[in-house]
From Swiss-Prot:
<feature type="transmembrane region" description="Helical">
    <location>
        <begin position="526"/>
        <end position="546"/>
    </location>
</feature>
<keyword id="KW-0808">Transferase</keyword>
<feature type="transmembrane region" description="Helical">
    <location>
        <begin position="644"/>
        <end position="664"/>
    </location>
</feature>
<dbReference type="InterPro" id="IPR029044">
    <property type="entry name" value="Nucleotide-diphossugar_trans"/>
</dbReference>
<feature type="transmembrane region" description="Helical">
    <location>
        <begin position="385"/>
        <end position="405"/>
    </location>
</feature>
<dbReference type="Pfam" id="PF01644">
    <property type="entry name" value="Chitin_synth_1"/>
</dbReference>
<keyword id="KW-0812">Transmembrane</keyword>
<feature type="transmembrane region" description="Helical">
    <location>
        <begin position="602"/>
        <end position="622"/>
    </location>
</feature>
<comment type="similarity">
    <text>Belongs to the chitin synthase family.</text>
</comment>
<dbReference type="InterPro" id="IPR004835">
    <property type="entry name" value="Chitin_synth"/>
</dbReference>
<feature type="transmembrane region" description="Helical">
    <location>
        <begin position="778"/>
        <end position="798"/>
    </location>
</feature>
<keyword id="KW-0328">Glycosyltransferase</keyword>
<dbReference type="GO" id="GO:0005886">
    <property type="term" value="C:plasma membrane"/>
</dbReference>
<feature type="transmembrane region" description="Helical">
    <location>
        <begin position="673"/>
        <end position="693"/>
    </location>
</feature>
<feature type="region of interest" description="Disordered">
    <location>
        <begin position="1"/>
        <end position="98"/>
    </location>
</feature>
<keyword id="KW-0472">Membrane</keyword>
<dbReference type="InterPro" id="IPR004834">
    <property type="entry name" value="Chitin_synth_fun"/>
</dbReference>
């Protein structure tokens, strides 16, 4: 080296270990050609990629050379002369960045591989804060342990190192969601953190520094399953760097790759960057990329068992990637815990995304689900919140108090029961338990309320909401509801079977009585759902046959025509039921898309005729009741048709309207009510039959992956002279390479994505044809509903109870009044919830 020449050293050691500086060889072909002490040549690009918020590119990167006339082009291009073997057609290949790696000797921390990696220069130039290590370096940890052993194996996180108290610990669980869905959720969380920073008068949040009390944990289920564009988005936030992770450390396979970084950027679903100039505060991100695909419940194990005890938060918020929380929704969830110290869990409203100007509601399937979600949030959740026990806090958007989740000193408690679901799937568990743990969040809710020597309750927060996509195709809808229905049915049986556990808790006697009343209410609902198949058929049979009854005057058409229509439609109904069993026992919904679509269409047509019969009978019944009673309402109640059919139906739907207006949310009654009515036969017949006929299928759609990969590299450890354990690691160290990888991630987000066409493989097609299962549950379900139908419709059986018309009218009145009674209980609970909300917040 010439005297006076500036000596350059690597300024970014990967860890706190002291390294011997190595002189940079300027003659190497891999060296940076423009040292810092020499000016670069003219035209050298100093423009950082994110300085103008988003990269802009000219429409034509290769302009027309001057002096030449415009050249006409032909598409597709025609080869000149004989085709060359090297000629290639199609999209130009993407630029492949080089990976310069240097072998470094790194000292292990408590035997664990931990690396502090500098973030890309273009990122730092685009953000305002760059004075501390949490903003300039990304921390990588290669976890080689089970989640339950994370803390005991010497692993730690940045929050205890920085001595920060965490009030909110938010987890985003994902599998293979794309960058749009991830950005929708992550940007929504960032806006919530910005709202927390605006609460300057709060004793907890204390204004602009509120972000220091919030940690966002992103858990991805499987390194080879994550969407590559989602990884690119995380890289542009500074959270993820390619080439750092390793498969094996010291002969131990890595189970999770943990990246920690405090980002100052957010990306909205339109792929636009938002920073401090747009009001976005910093955000502490903990990205856990699991090596293997082990299902969502294992992701929650990393969150609750590995990271939770280290961070020790007050409130944990669970959000599925794809769900967009409202701008202040997370604050309102947290506020419920702050106001009431005995709240163990809370949830907000789950809304179905309706698209711009509600265009998605033009799909009847989406509209029906929108109505279902709305009425659940207006009637069901408020009632359960008044009792103190909500049967399910949706995993898509809910929150728990971390201390309430903890097990006792013997290891028994809510989390112990919750994580049993990870080992209770497949052949190792009985069919009842395996189906029950399809809805393990219901088990967690019950275990929290029934926790021994505690008086925890669950609460619904109507001012908090999260928006999510709902299935817009028939196969996806049926597959989703199969897991929901089976899980809720068996988990409901579990809660009712263990009703005594509530009496071992420290709840007051009045609260325990309220729980017992709720158990009776749920038992009646469970029995009603068991006989829903028979009840719906009987309702159809009785109403359509009544159009030809002699007592009905006037009739819409002659008795002969009414009888013929009733017979034909009755046979069609029975045929459709048989078809549903055939499809459910031998086919996947994806393999019988048009059969299910046709079935839904025919059931909707039958519902139209059924509604016509209901309206006609109602109008005639009211006229007869008024004429016979001379205007006396008491005398009108004596008319069985008026009392059993008209009042029960009108009161049920009237409560729907009144409750919706009380919650200032009535629009679904006008935009989605009719679609729900027409699809209600499909809810009862198609969804229930498919769910019960597939109780053998206890899968989540994914299978555990236990293989050890080595594509990231293997880290081998050895002892040095001082007795410390060190490893040799190959990681990107040249700032130029780090910057190139960052720019590649940014460019990846600007690339147009071609829609992928999914194809079924031969094995799946074969399973579509050969899967069959018949259990005693399905047989008993069919027989019990069949007996009910025969008892009511047969002329000779139970003749002592009157004629068919008398028996059918009485039973229909029982069914309709049961529906009205259950709706009345929900309506009263909804009203009490609104009253308590006024006085208690």
């Amino acid at each position: 080296m010439n005297p006076g020449q500036k000596q350059e050293h690597d300024q970014y050691p990967l860890h706190d270990t002291q390294f011997v500086p190595q002189q940079m060889d300027r003659n190497s072909p891999f060296a940076d050609p423009y040292p810092e002490d020499q000016p670069p040549p003219s035209g050298y690009d100093h423009q950082p990629l994110l300085r103008d918020n988003a990269p802009s590119y000219p429409p034509d990167p290769f302009g027309q050379p001057g002096g030449y006339p415009p050249q006409s082009t032909m598409y597709p291009p025609q080869p000149m002369g004989p085709p060359s073997p090297n000629m290639r057609y199609g999209e130009a290949p993407r630029r492949q960045p080089r990976r310069y790696k240097t072998t470094r000797r790194v000292k292990l921390t408590h035997g664990n591989l931990i690396l502090d990696c500098p973030v890309p220069t273009p990122y730092l130039q685009a953000v305002p804060i760059k004075d501390t290590k949490e903003f300039t370096h990304m921390r990588y940890t290669a976890a080689t342990c089970d989640p339950a052993d994370f803390a005991s194996q010497g692993y730690t996180l940045r929050q205890p190192i920085l001595q920060r108290n965490t009030e909110l610990f938010i987890v985003l669980t994902m599998y293979n969601e794309d960058e749009i869905l991830f950005a929708r959720t992550m940007h929504g969380v960032m806006k919530n953190i910005a709202h927390l920073c605006s609460r300057v008068r709060s004793n907890v949040w204390e204004g602009p520094k509120a972000w220091e009390k919030v940690v966002v944990c992103i858990v991805s289920d499987g390194r080879k399953k994550i969407h590559p564009r989602t990884l690119s988005l995380l890289a542009t936030l500074g959270v993820y760097q390619d080439g750092v992770a390793k498969n094996v450390v010291g002969d131990k396979p890595v189970t999770a790759h943990i990246y920690e970084y405090t980002t100052q950027l957010s990306v909205d679903p339109e792929m636009k960057f938002k920073g401090a100039d747009k009001g976005m505060p910093p955000c502490q991100i903990l990205f856990c990329l699991k090596e293997n695909n082990q299902k969502k419940i294992n992701s929650h194990r990393w969150f609750f068992q590995a990271f939770g005890p280290v961070i020790n938060p007050n409130v944990c918020v669970l959000i599925d990637v794809g769900t967009r929380p409202g701008k202040t929704s997370i604050y309102h969830l947290w506020k419920a815990f702050d106001i009431s110290s005995n709240i163990a869990g809370a949830c907000g409203e789950i809304r179905a995304m309706s698209g711009t100007a509600g265009v998605a509601l033009l799909n009847p399937l989406v509209a029906a689900q929108n109505f279902e979600y709305k009425m659940s949030n207006i009637l069901d959740k408020p009632l359960e919140s008044v009792f103190g026990y909500i049967s399910v806090l949706p995993g898509a958007f809910s929150a728990y108090r971390f201390t309430a989740l903890q097990n006792d000193e013997n290891g028994h408690g809510p989390l112990e029961k919750y994580f049993l679901g990870e080992s209770q799937h497949g052949a190792d568990a009985d069919i009842f338990t395996a189906n029950m743990y399809l809805a393990e969040d219901r088990i967690l809710c019950y275990e929290l309320v029934a926790k021994k020597k505690a008086n925890w309750v669950l609460h619904y927060v109507s001012s908090s909401y999260g928006e999510t996509d709902v299935p817009d195709s028939v196969p996806e809808f049926i597959s989703q509801r199969r897991r929901w229905l089976n899980g809720s049915f068996f988990a409901g049986c579990y809660a009712l079977f263990h009703w005594r556990k509530v009496w071992a808790s420290d709840h007051s006697f009045v609260r325990k009585l309220m729980f017992m009343f709720e158990d009776l209410y749920n038992t009646y609902n469970l029995i009603f759902s068991w006989f829903a198949l028979g009840n719906f058929y009987l309702t159809f049979y009785i109403l359509t046959s009544a159009l030809g009854a002699e007592s009905l005057d006037p009739k819409p058409f002659s008795a002969n025509v009414a009888s013929i229509l009733h017979t034909i439609l009755n046979y069609i109904y029975i045929l459709l039921i048989i078809v549903q069993f055939i499809l459910a026992l031998g086919n996947r919904p994806q393999g019988s898309k048009w059969a299910y679509f046709g079935s839904m269409t025919f059931f909707a047509i039958l519902m139209v005729y059924m509604m016509f019969a209901t309206i006609w009978i109602t109008v005639v019944g009211v006229q007869d009741a008024v004429a016979n009673a001379d205007g006396s309402f008491t005398a009108m109640l004596g008319e069985s048709t008026f009392r059993n059919i008209i009042i029960s139906i009108v009161s049920t739907y009237a409560m729907y309207f009144i409750a919706s207006f009380l919650f200032f949310d009535p629009w679904h009654m006008f935009t989605s009510f009719i679609q729900y009515i027409f699809l209600s036969p499909s809810y009862t017949n198609i969804l229930n039959i498919y769910a019960f006929c597939n109780t053998h299928d206890v899968s989540w759609g994914t299978k555990g992956d236990n293989t050890v990969s080595t594509d990231l590299g293997v880290v081998k450890s050895k002892k040095d002279g001082s007795g410390d354990t060190t490893v040799e690691v190959e990681v990107p160290t040249e700032q130029k390479d780090i910057n190139e990888a960052y720019e590649e991630a940014c460019v990846e987000l600007t690339r147009q994505v071609e829609p992928e066409v999914s194809h079924r493989d031969a094995k799946t097609k074969q399973e579509d044809y050969y899967r069959s299962f018949r259990t005693r549950l399905v047989i008993s379900w069919i027989i019990s509903n069949l007996i009910l139908v025969v008892l009511i419709t047969n002329e000779n059986i139970l003749a002592s109870f009157g004629t068919f018309e008398v028996r059918s009218t009485s039973y229909l009145g029982f069914v309709l009044w049961s529906v009205a009674g259950l709706s009345a209980i929900r309506f009263c609970g909804s009203g009490l919830y609104l009253i308590f909300r006024i006085f208690m917040g």
